[in-house]
Structures are given as structure tokens and as C-alpha cells.
Amino acid sequence: MAEFIGSIDQGTTSSRFLIFNKAGEPVASHQEEFSQIYPQPGWHEHDPEEIVSSVHNCIEGAVEAFKKDGNSVDSIKAIGITNQRETTVVWDIESGEALYNAIVWTDTRSQHIVKELKSRKGADELTQKCGLPLSTYPSVTKLLWLLKNEPRVKEAYEKGTLAFGTIDAWLVYKLNGHEKRVFVSDPTNASRTMFMDIHTLKYNPELIAFFGDEEFDLSRIHMPDIVKSSDAKAYGTIGSGVLSGFSLTGCLGDQSAALVGQKGFDAGSAKNTYGTGSFILYNTGNKPVISTHGLLTTVAYDFDGTPSYALEGSIAVAGSGVKFLMNNLGFSFDSSKITELAGTVENNGGLVFVTAFSGLFAPYWITDTQGTIFGITQHTQRGHIARATLEAVCYQTKAVLDAMEKDSGHPLQELKVDGGMSNSELCMQIQADILAENKIPIVRPKMRETTALGAAIAAGFAAGVWKNFEELKEVNTVGETVFEAKMEAKDSAKGIKRWERAVNMCRGWLVDDE
């Protein structure tokens, strides 16, 4: 009998359930969007119960389609989970009831808490311990806001029944049934809380103590056990529905899942997801590397008790730059037309578009600038601006990868790509040309559901569907496209130099003119 693996893909705007065969091909799927709640500017919430319901609905829908195609449900050997990271849920450990909406990873309401934490003694040592800098992104500041502002959360804390977790922990807890108390999280998610020691993959009492105060001793809060990303028993079984009794055997945060789905198992392997923004993960091997360029240190995966680590960097404007041309400048109503427009010119005509709409992330970390276009002449056409918009993403990707290579000590081996912008042949060729001096291939799989596939791989590995990493490397290889540089490295270097000059020239634009 053929073997299949289910994958729960719980994202920021929708939930999905996909069923993959052993070759990594999706054979059935179902998707459901859920409510986005914005109570105030900068606040972003989800209803935790609606998320669970959406996951159940997706499982039912995908399995129904799977059965209609003549497949047996019993051929599904394992189920994995991948999820939006950092999003924070608090609930009562006894009743299983959520005490407040989930605070989403994009939420910035805890800025004042971050400012206060940065003033505490030992704040400058946090990154060395947990891999993350203090910001509004990690789960800890969301938890602190809830403790200080929501009476039901404080009441549960005082009763000793307050449970805290990221979306993976909440889903596992609820899918099993709260009475079973299966309360676990994998290291790729636990590493985003700032409570986990990046070196030991265990909760660090010093970190937990740092974030507490006279009113709240965070060690009293119930936190999930940290277990391997791929484990045949730790995640329990689904307690109800069409897959009741089926085992949950793997879990990965979304960006780590994408790296696994791209089979980035070797040190020096990198993946870039070109979405609204871009998320780059770079495998650094079996030891965590603390960046000197402001990159994040995270866990790539832990399948067998020997974790692999990654450096993570992000680019704020990728696909959103294309949308800017469409919505703000009226270039087109179709994103594919933007890349066609970029292809109407042979080069950028000397034009550079630094798409720093809200500053630039690593390795630049420039906050005192805005989007800037250099090199406009009377010969500039819309195609030049469109091409420069694509190039901006590719130049920033080059800068992030170079910083990762320097930090890690592992030469860049390859770049695996996915996400909406990777559909553009032109954009991927531009990326290959900009990386000419690195002499590495850019590999784009035909099947680009790599995040969901990563969760399926984690689950299937624990269930014995795949026996080793060599077998996994053969998954999802059919029809992949390889892009290699067509430009000479010396010519590529000229464009990189011009880009870096433009970045430096736009520093300091945001100043007080009064």
C-alpha cells in the first residue's frame, strides 16, 4: 500500500491541510481563512478557538477529497504541523479555555515593555543565551503585556493554572483534547519565546528570571515541554474527527519547515521565501552561531537529538514592492505584468530603487531613511523602475547571504527559493546574476508547497516513511529549475557597488528639520 503523510499548515491568514505522497507530491488539500482582528493601530489578534476549528475543517475537507480519489484513510501514516511563529496563546491548563485572543507575531503593542526591558541589567547578554534580540516579535513581551493588562490572565496566574504557548503548543493541546494534557513544543518554536537556551534547547532559569519582576514570577507559569521536531510519541494523537486516533509525529515553525521542505540539511544550504517580505534561513550546522551582523540565531530542526541551527535574516519589502508599483503608481493590476514590464529593458538604465519604505533590516539596520530612487534621467522608463524593484530584493538577498556566510564560517553551497516572486523567471535570473561571484546554483522546485512539505517530512521521518536524510534528499526533485549566473562576476560586482553606494547615500534622510 502506498504511504501518505498529512500536514497541518497553520499560517497567519489561513489554515490548510495537505496530504503528500512519499515523493513529496500533494495529492489532496483544503484551505480555510479565518478572522483577522485589529482592535487598535499596531494590534493584531486571532481567535484561538477559530484557529482550531479551521484546522479541523481543513482536515475534514482534504480527507474527503483524498477518499474521493479512491485512497484509503489508513494509508496516512503520520501527521505533521507547521505554524506561524511567535504568535502567543494563553489558556487555563485545567479547562483548556483560551483566556484572551492570540497576539500575532506582527503585533507591536509591547513596545513600551521592550524599552523597559532594554534598561535592565543583563539585557545585553540575552542574544548570547537565546539567539534573539529584544523586540516586539518574540513571544515573551506579548506574554508580559497579557499579564499586566488582562485580569483573566492575571487571575489564572494567581491560581497557578496559567498556560502559555505558541500556536504549535496550543494546536497539539487542543487536537489531542485538553483532558489528555499533551503540552509540548518543538525547538524551532520554543526558540522564538526568548525563554529557551539556544545552546541546550532547554528553558533557561536565568532567562525566565530576567523577564519576571516583583509582581510576576514567570517560573509559576505552565510552559510546554520542549521535544524533538520529529518524534513518534511526544505529540500524541488527534482526539476527534475523521482522523481520530492518528498520530501527530512532527512539528516545525514555518520558516524552519520551509528549509526542511527545501532539503536544506547541509551547512551552507540556504533558502529564501520571496513573499510580501523575504525570509532567508542559512544552515550553520550543529552549533549555534551568534551573528555579528544583527541576524537571528534559531533552530533549523531537531530530528534525532542532534539539532541543526540556522541564521535568519529578513527583507522588509519584496512582493510588497511589486504591489506598491501596482497599487500606488498604477503600473498594472497584475503582478505578472510587472515582471513582464521589467523584461522590456535590458538593464536598469543606471537606476537604483532602495525600497526602504520603513528602513532596512539586516545587515544594514538603517532606520533613519525611506524609499529612495537614484539615477532617474530623461530616458528612464517604467520598465527601468520595475526592474530596479526586483533588483532591490535580489541585492538585499545578496547582502544577507554574504553576512551569513561570514558569520557562519560555512561557504554558501546553494540557494533554494520559493514564495510568489520565485515564480518570475526574470527575477530568479537577476538573483543568479547578482550572486555570480558566489558561484552557486539557485534551485526552484516545481512543487513549491515547501513549508507544508517540511512538516510532512518531520512527521514522516519519525514514522519511518523515510529512514534517513539521504532518502529525504530525493523528495520533491522532479521538475526543479536551476538558475545559474549568465553575467560575469566583474560586471555583477559593478551593480553591487552601485547598490551599496545608493544605500549609504540614503542614510540620514529622516532628520528633524526644525
Give the location of each predicted region.
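Acidic, glycine/GT-rich loop-and beta-edge segments that sit at the periphery of enzyme/chaperone cores
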Residues: 321, 462-514
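Phosphate/ATP-binding catalytic cores across multiple sugar-kinase/actin-like superfamilies
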Residues: 58-65, 255-258, 385-413, 501-514
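Glycine-rich phosphate-binding/hydrolytic loop that grips phosphoryl groups
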Residues: 115, 257-261, 311, 391, ...
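Activation-segment/catalytic-loop signature of the eukaryotic protein kinase fold
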Residues: 349-444, 451
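Conserved ATP-utilizing enzyme core subdomain
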Residues: 15-18, 169, 173-182, 323, ...
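Short beta-strand-loop/turn "lid" adjacent to the catalytic site in phosphate-handling enzymes
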Residues: 66-104, 133-137, 172-197, 227-228, ...
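N-terminal glycine/serine-rich phosphate-binding loop of ATP-dependent small-molecule kinases
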Residues: 1-100, 128, 155, 242-247, ...
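ATP-dependent carbohydrate kinase catalytic cores
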Residues: 189-306, 310, 316-321, 326, ...
